[in-house]
Regions:
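A conserved beta-strand-loop-helix scaffold within acyl/acetyltransferase catalytic domains
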Residues: 4-87, 196-283
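Generic intrinsically disordered, low-complexity segments enriched for polar/acidic and small residues
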Residues: 32, 61, 90, 101, ...
Length: 300
């Protein structure tokens, strides 16, 4: 007789959960023992914090939802969010999905819950439990800056299942029109008042901490994720993310940090597309001139 059990995940479950993710089309973490840095190296993790829950059928893991503690600040108070990760259930056991996610919602340690990487399948479950999307109309809209038009168009057509030969032909025909856009990028206004320092996460200085203190002091009524140097190092200086070569573009004026932009590689092996993604961007007072200069420094 089949025995279904939901229990708190253990660090020893990492390999089995990784296998679960892979057989359900989720990449999972690139490095071994990724759970160590996700939780044990996390400043806001405690032994009382559940790292997630697993769904077992006869002692075989067939479902999982992770639970990462992330710090936010609002009205001068620190809030610890339970951030869901890798919510996945084998197809034949998805009738237990609500029971699994209910364990996540019943935890007592988190002040709020965040689902930052929901796909179409998991988002339908989140909606059933009344989770709300963030109040920003374009939060799920992707913007592209095309560097190699031929490769980009070819990859896009292949993703749409257009035959290889036809994709190649169309990409060469359309590429010149896209390249024209590249020629007019310099229409962005230039500014000599800013400097940009390019660094790896470990090279960050305490100027980032000064910037963070200014931002949170000037925005007490905004719900902000922690962006001090330690938080950035935790997120970007680990074996898993190092494979994506994170770089930080720090916007400086008179030797004072006014903002930063973090980029990582997210190449698509399946479609042969090389991609660099803006993973984080913040500037003092959300100044449009600073934002434009930061983006321009990266793109150009």
């Amino acid at each position: 007789m089949e025995k279904i059990v939901i229990r708190i995940a253990k660090f020893e479950d990492e390999k089995l959960v990784h296998n679960l993710c892979q057989r359900n089309g989720l990449a999972g973490e690139i490095s071994n023992q990724a759970w160590n840095w996700i939780w044990k190296d996390n400043s806001f993790y405690t032994e009382a914090w559940p790292i997630g829950w697993v769904l077992e059928s006869n002692n075989i893991i067939v479902g999982y939802i992770g639970n990462i503690p992330r710090a936010y600040i609002f009205n001068g108070q620190t809030w610890i969010a339970g951030v869901a990760r890798s919510f996945v259930v084998d197809l034949e056991y998805r009738r237990y999905s609500l029971q699994l996610i209910s364990e996540f919602f019943q935890q007592k340690e988190a002040d709020l819950f965040i689902f930052s990487s929901a796909n179409n399948l998991s988002s339908s479950i989140y909606k059933m439990v009344k989770a709300k999307p963030i109040p920003q109309d374009s939060f799920d809209t992707d913007l592209f800056w095309i560097v190699s038009p031929t490769s980009f168009i070819y990859s896009l057509l292949r993703k749409k299942r257009v035959p290889k030969s036809l994709s190649l032909l169309i990409s060469y025909l359309i590429a010149p029109f896209v390249m024209f856009e590249n020629l007019v990028r310099n229409r962005w206004p230039k500014s000599e008042n800013f400097d940009v320092e390019i660094s790896t996460p470990k090279m960050l200085t305490t100027e980032i901490d000064k910037l963070w203190h200014q931002i949170k002091a000037n925005n007490p009524n905004k719900f902000l994720s922690y962006r001090d140097r330690d938080s950035i190092l935790w997120q970007y200086d680990n074996d898993s993310v190092k494979n994506r070569n994170p770089l930080i573009f720090t916007l400086m004026k008179n030797n004072v940090a006014l903002g930063y932009l973090i980029v990582v590689e997210m190449n698509s092996i399946e479609f042969g597309l090389k991609r660099i993604v803006i993973d984080d961007l913040i500037v003092y007072d959300n100044d449009p001139t600073s934002i434009n200069f930061s983006e321009r420094s990266f793109f150009l």
